[in-house]
């Protein structure tokens, strides 16, 4: 089937997260899974939604990442956090939920473009199709393959591929 295959990890509450982080067996299982999966499927892209500075369980996965995307929304809270963040060499900022009709979004984005932040040139716009797909419990591509967000995700993939290939070669 064409499109993206998604394996959702789900939401882990704080108590379970602490238990997972403290469990040596959980760490071993995750490391084994990651190693086995990447050996069996070396050309597969794996996207992980993590908070690496707060998540010791996946810290080694983040260290092995070819590309790290720090997802942000053009707003004051994110602006403050970006200015406090130290970026890794393989880390880029991905603007998410951008609304072209929002003056504040335009102002922050324009200001960020003049900064030294390592920006991904693709920005993901706010798209109602995503909310509708979630409500329908369908992947976005299956729900509405021709929506703007699917096109932007494809563009993001096209931008990431040369970076991945240059790091492999």
Where are these regions (language model features)?
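Short, hydrophobic alpha-helical segments
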Residues: 157-168
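Inter-motif core of Ras-like GTPase G domains
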Residues: 53-76
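Anionic-ligand binding region
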Residues: 67-70, 76-91
């Amino acid at each position: 089937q064409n499109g993206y295959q998604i394996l959702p990890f789900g939401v882990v509450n704080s108590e379970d997260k602490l238990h997972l982080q403290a469990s040596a067996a959980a760490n071993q299982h995750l490391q084994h899974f990651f190693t086995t999966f990447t050996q069996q499927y070396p050309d597969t892209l794996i996207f992980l939604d993590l908070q690496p500075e707060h998540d010791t369980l996946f810290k080694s996965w983040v260290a092995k990442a070819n590309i790290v995307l720090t997802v942000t929304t053009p707003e004051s809270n994110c602006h403050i956090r970006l200015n406090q963040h130290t970026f890794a060499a393989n880390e880029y900022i991905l603007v998410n939920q951008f609304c072209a009709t929002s003056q504040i979004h335009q102002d922050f984005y324009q200001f960020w473009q003049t900064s030294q932040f390592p920006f991904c040139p693709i920005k993901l716009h706010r798209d109602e199709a995503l909310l509708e797909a979630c409500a329908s419990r369908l992947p976005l591509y299956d729900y509405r393959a021709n929506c703007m967000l699917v096109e932007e995700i494809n563009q993001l993939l096209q931008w990431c591929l040369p970076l991945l290939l240059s790091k492999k070669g």
